[in-house]
């Protein structure tokens, strides 16, 4: 099984970048890597009633992905880091998505 360290190394991203709190603009990009957003939401620590509320309130999958990440960031505040997001992708079995998301995080942090 891949670790966050493995993913960061494969993506060419320093681990200290992943320890940062997720910014809103990068969260919008990371939503693209949440193909199975309900599974990822569970791994991010959202409760079933929170997931159901997002699912019921919004129509499109894209809106649901963004809302789920917004809910996670709101709930976890400074603990909503890129590292935690990559861990959730890995726990959901989304290794390639984790690598691609890590690359996007690295690209955003270099600006």
Give a label for each model feature.
Residues 6-29, 36-111:
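Alpha-helical death-domain superfamily interaction modules
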């Amino acid at each position: 099984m891949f670790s966050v360290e493995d993913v960061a190394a494969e993506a060419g991203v320093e681990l200290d970048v992943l320890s940062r709190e997720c910014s809103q603009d990068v969260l919008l990009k990371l939503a693209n890597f949440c193909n199975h957003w309900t599974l990822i939401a569970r791994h991010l620590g959202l409760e079933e009633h929170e997931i159901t509320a997002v699912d019921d309130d919004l129509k499109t999958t894209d809106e649901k992905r963004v809302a789920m990440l917004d809910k996670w960031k709101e709930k976890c505040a400074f603990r909503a880091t890129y590292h935690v997001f990559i861990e959730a992708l890995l726990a959901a079995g989304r290794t390639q998505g984790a690598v691609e998301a890590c690359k996007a995080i690295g690209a955003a942090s270099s600006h």
